[in-house]
Design a protein with these regions (language model features):
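Long, well-ordered mid-to-C-terminal structural blocks that present hydrophobic/aromatic surfaces
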Residues: 1-56
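Solvent-exposed loop and edge beta-strand segments that line ligand/cofactor-binding
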Residues: 8-26, 56-72, 118-131
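Hydrophobic strand positions within the blades of repeat-based beta-sheet folds
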Residues: 29, 75-76, 135
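Terminal, non-catalytic domain-edge segments
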Residues: 32-35, 39-43, 51, 55, ...
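Loop/turn-rich, solvent-exposed surfaces of beta-rich toroidal or solenoidal domains
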Residues: 62-94
Length: 156
């Protein structure tokens, strides 16, 4: 089955437990599919994507990390980007799920959480994808700061 047929068949949405992370997640895949639908001017595909965006129900406890790549700030970044298409109702919830991981005692105020062999490791990082830089970038955009270099368009 194709990706779209797995989530949409017989005119019924088949959304299940989705992976909403930025890297290899369903939101980015559907954004790509939506952009393709716009290019080929396929209203049926566009409708599928918009219904997917409306059905987003993110279970944040599954996301261990606040980071952009595989954590809560990546979800926030995607939802902020989707504002161009529609008004996602989960933007504020996504923001609060990033902020809950803020700790004054951490070097960069946020820590990446990696899981290996059933154990969790918390790491102080300051890079874009798995560190505090990406988290602060998403928070800045949430508060309306301008993306002067167009990074959002590059990574989305």
């Amino acid at each position: 089955k194709t990706y779209v047929k797995k989530i949409y068949k017989n005119e019924k949405i088949q959304f299940g437990d989705r992976n909403y992370t930025w890297c290899y997640g369903d939101l980015v895949m559907m954004q790509t599919f939506y952009n393709a639908a716009l290019i080929i001017q396929n209203e049926s595909y566009k409708k599928i994507c918009l219904e997917f965006f409306e059905a987003i129900n993110i279970k944040y406890r599954k996301l261990l990390s606040p980071t952009l790549c595989h954590g809560n700030s990546g979800v926030l970044l995607q939802l902020l980007h989707f504002r161009k298409i529609h008004r996602p109702r989960n933007v504020n919830l996504a923001f609060f799920n990033v902020i809950k991981d803020y700790k004054e005692s951490y070097i960069y105020k946020f820590r990446d959480c990696e899981k290996y062999d059933g154990r969790r490791y918390y790491l102080d990082k300051n890079n874009l994808l798995t560190g505090s830089l990406g988290i602060y970038y998403a928070i800045d955009l949430y508060f309306g700061l301008e993306d002067h270099v167009g990074l959002l368009n590059l990574i989305m």
